[in-house]
């Protein structure tokens, strides 16, 4: 598992909701990634809808997948 220092964080917008709490997110640099919700967001029932601004953590080893860690209000 990647250390906290190795994670890359991006801002993005949810463009599509996929099954099993997965989302397609368009990052600020134009790339699209598939992201899932972090455990704490799942635990606290934070809802994510299409069009929401989110923060996505990604590992440098696989830049096509990420984890949504924050939803902007």
From Swiss-Prot:
Keywords: Cytoplasm, Initiation factor, Protein biosynthesis, RNA-binding, rRNA-binding. Pfam families: eIF-1a. It is found in: Cytoplasm. One of its GO terms (molecular function) is rRNA binding. It comes from the Bacteria. PROSITE patterns: S1_IF1_TYPE (PS50832). Its main location: cytoplasm. SMART domains: S1. Component of the 30S ribosomal translation pre-initiation complex which assembles on the 30S ribosome in the order IF-2 and IF-3, IF-1 and N-formylmethionyl-tRNA(fMet); mRNA recruitment can occur at any time during PIC assembly. This is Translation initiation factor IF-1. It comes from Acinetobacter baumannii (strain ATCC 17978 / DSM 105126 / CIP 53.77 / LMG 1025 / NCDC KC755 / 5377).
